[in-house]
Amino acid sequence: MGLLSGDTLGPLAVALLIFLLLLDLMHRRSRWAPRYPPGPTPLPVLGNLLQVDFEDPRPSFNQLRRRFGNVFSLQQVWTPVVVLNGLAAVREALVYRSQDTADRPPPAVYEHLGYGPRAEGVILARYGDAWREQRRFSLTTLRNFGLGKKSLEQWVTEEASCLCAAFADQAGRPFSPMDLLNKAVSNVIASLTFGCRFEYNDPRIIKLLDLTEDGLKEEFNLVRKVVEAVPVLLSIPGLAARVFPAQKAFMALIDELIAEQKMTRDPTQPPRHLTDAFLDEVKEAKGNPESSFNDENLRLVVADLFSAGMVTTSTTLAWALLLMILHPDVQRRVQQEIDEVIGQVRRPEMGDQALMPFTVAVVHEVQRFADIVPLGLPHMTSRDIEVQGFHIPKGTTLITNLSSVLKDETVWEKPFRFHPEHFLDAQGRFVKQEAFIPFSAGRRACLGEPLARMELFLFFTSLLQHFSFSVPAGQPRPSEHGVFAFLVTPAPYQLCAVPR
């Protein structure tokens, strides 16, 4: 008789079920705390996984917000989650309680990519000394290689010239701008990280872009959420390769690019770029087991810069061009301002912003309307906190619904319409808005914000300086509704770029 006969399987199944239910009850204890945020009743073990559409959670969150208010709770298998909506709740958590909400959920789901102690990159790193060390290094290195100086501005304007040349090659024919925008922005990141740019037909940049896009799609599916909540499942042989094939291939390509830089590096010379600067820090930290400067972390820091700094900016630019062809009156006003301040010969400069309030307002309104990262990146509480009168225990994952701020009907005059006047006063002067937080807020706000602002202004003004954009003749009007896949991208569209 086998060990697992019919007589023993029944009691074992009952025992396993009882164990899982007890474990489930243990993980639900936080929901019983006084003043814990309300939320839908979770199912045993699964929590609320079946009640939220993770292909696009925004509609689910909007329904739950209407039902439970600006602060509501979910259970993701056994992970407690609180969703924050509206400027007051988001600001209270990320700004006023910044130190207590600056942590990230443990990135166990990314261990297959090389994440581990002392190797967490910057974006997903736990809040602590390693994160501070890497954020400080990244900001210092960006400054040393030109952020806030003319050198980086020149890189961007030169790349903008290459982009304009590629647009001109289309000879006024209909085309999709997304691919060229991706390549231009990725070249700015490549200049910072590797000191080089790729030709737009280079197979490596094409592969890099394809894997980045596919890797982002892998972030939002039900299987991914299950292994995130129960990371032990990733120990199943071959599962990670099946769930995250693009992310693993992306990291392999990053390894190849770093290896090329190591082969050409001369340690006796000043660092050429961020990778060299990081390798110098690795040498300095040799023998220090507490340092986050190591080869494993280098690949993650570089991957962070590419994955976060490339697609977000190029997607925003794609939205900008879409909105220009849908709102030709706005396009004409931007071009008029460009002609008056810059002309049609001189390259745009960051110093021009002070004299171009309408163009700056348009760029801001593109970011607000496009709302490309509607849910931000998850935070985690490092101690018990209170937000809007609700008790949120230590170890709770926080999701900040940035879309609820960028399109808050109590803040914006026309929240669901493209309306550059949101950022202009009665005299036509640019006005900052407190509810404008596309880069998030607090200690974990996007460290690439200054670079992104530079790229958006210089690429956008360069393109509108040289071209007029329109919907191709005979094609239907493109949609203003985006497609959600972690980022919100425009639905596929084409345009015509006619030289001015």
From Swiss-Prot:
Primary enzyme class: oxidoreductase
Induction: P450 can be induced to high levels in liver and other tissues by various foreign compounds, including drugs, pesticides, and carcinogens.
Binding positions for heme per the UniProt entry: 446
InterPro entries referenced in this protein's UniProt entry, alphabetically: Cyt_P450 (IPR001128), Cyt_P450_CS (IPR017972), Cyt_P450_E_grp-I (IPR002401), Cyt_P450_E_grp-I_CYP2D-like (IPR008069), Cyt_P450_sf (IPR036396), Cytochrome_P450_fam2 (IPR050182)
Keyword check for DNA-binding: no
Keyword Endoplasmic reticulum: yes
Membrane topology, as annotated: Peripheral membrane protein
PROSITE patterns associated with the record: CYTOCHROME_P450 (PS00086)
Predominant location: endoplasmic reticulum
Alphabetized Gene3D superfamilies for the sequence: Cytochrome P450
Subcellular location: Endoplasmic reticulum membrane; Microsome membrane
Function: Cytochromes P450 are a group of heme-thiolate monooxygenases. In liver microsomes, this enzyme is involved in an NADPH-dependent electron transport pathway. It oxidizes a variety of structurally unrelated compounds, including steroids, fatty acids, and xenobiotics.
Protein name (Swiss-Prot/TrEMBL): Cytochrome P450 2D14
Species for this entry: Bos taurus
Taxonomy of the source species: Eukaryota, Metazoa, Chordata, Craniata, Vertebrata
Gene: CYP2D14
